[in-house]
Amino acid sequence: MARPRAATYDDQRSQILRAAADLFARRGYTAATLNEVASASGVSKATLYHYFSDKHALLEDIVSSHVARLQGIAAEAGAPPTEPPGSTHGAAEARLRRLVRRFMQAYADAQSEHRVLTEDVKFLDERARGAVLDGQRQVVAAFAQGIAACRPDLRAELHKPMAMLLFGMINWTFTWLRPDGVLTPADLGDIVVDLFFGGLPAVAATLAPAQADARPPELR
């Protein structure tokens, strides 16, 4: 189904990008055509070319914009606030928990874009792929710094591997976490952090009452 037409240049450009991301995620980058992107966006092919020179340009914008959003979240949620000297270890854990929760929500809000990033980045040319990979490294570094703040006793060479293990728990949740399911992205983010910090014994046996009561009756 074609999307409604956007009112402004930026709105229409964003509309085309979102439609292309949905299409690439559903059909695959190589199978999707610009005619299909134009149709899904509710624009003519000529209008599509006004914004993007080719399919590669669409792919590059989708993945680079998504990574830039993740970088912004990492910078905002992972940055330590102004704290007095000797601030508690618990503050560092709270920042890492906030970071994971924000990433889980970002993945849920941009499932198509995240799928395109994980599956289609290999189709970018060397320059564009390098820029995206640099952005991803910065995101991993932000997580590694968060882990180091939680465990300052860890050897420095363990910070990145620990961050990659944490990403291993969250990066593919978009493939199975249902928007109408029992767990919200924030719920699952908390479980991930509990599991990461404490292992299986640290995971709560049930959802907190407030979380459980917020679910639709049919899911209780």
Task: Set out the residue ranges of the language-model regions.
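N-terminal intrinsically disordered/low-complexity leader segments
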Residues: M1-D11, R18, P81-P84, A204-R220
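Amphipathic alpha-helical packing segments from all-alpha helical-bundle domains
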Residues: A68-A74, E126-R151, K160-M164, D187-D190, ...
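Hydrophobic alpha-helical segments that form the core
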Residues: R102, A156-T175, A186-G199, R220
